[in-house]
Amino acid sequence: MKFYSRFIALLGMLVAVSAFAGIPDSPQQVQPPSVGTRAPIFAARTAQGTLRTFEPDSYKKPTVVLFYRGGWCPYCNAQLSDLHLVEPKLRKSGFEIVFLSTDRPELLYSSLKATDIHYTLLSDSHLEAAKAFHVVYHVDAATLAKMREYGVDLEATTGTKEHELPVPSVFIIDTSGTIRFVYSNPDYTIRLGADALWAAAQPLATVK
């Protein structure tokens, strides 16, 4: 029994080390899942701190899952404002829309410059969901210093000392839990626009 316990503990440590070692050092190295693969299990917290878990077999609606850097990011705010134009059409077509931010739960809404948000905003401050989708990378010291110059303290906004960010990415997952669309661009200034998202989503609409 003692040997078994030690084995399990060692296995857990190896998994943890492997997961850490597998995180790229640049956004260009991330490898998100491909179209046609099963969506990973992931969880994130609401602004109230409630944990929501998403499993491949539990999707009642086709779902848009979007990873963004945080409310402090002007490009993220611009994207959320742009997608606001297509959000009513997506909902009427039967979609759920889930946005995942690195901000702590209590900062989810207060940090945003965009207003009148009707998306489901969830906190992925430890980037566990981003890791599940393989879109997370380590932020180097030079970038961290530049962010601080602009008044962005990543440790304060995430509540961690991991210094990680997601590559801004969009996934569309159907009701079977299969990924049907992927957009992931290592250049955080280039985002998927509302028209492109709507075009990608239409084939999966459950309400015509």
Descriptions of predicted regions:
Residues 1-9:
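Bacterial N-terminal signal peptides that target proteins for export
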Residues 124-189:
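Thiol/selenol-based redox catalytic cores and closely related redox-interacting motifs
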Residues 55-83:
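Short active-site neighborhood of thiol/selenol oxidoreductases, capturing the structured segment around
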Residues 8-18:
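Bacterial N-terminal signal peptides
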Residues 39-40, 62, 167-169:
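Short loop/turn microsegments at loop-to-beta-strand junctions
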Residues 23-55:
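N-terminal "domain-start" segment that seeds a small globular fold
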Residues 188-203:
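A short, polar/charged loop-to-alpha-helix boundary motif
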Residues 78-134:
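Structural microenvironment flanking redox-active thiols in thiol-disulfide oxidoreductases
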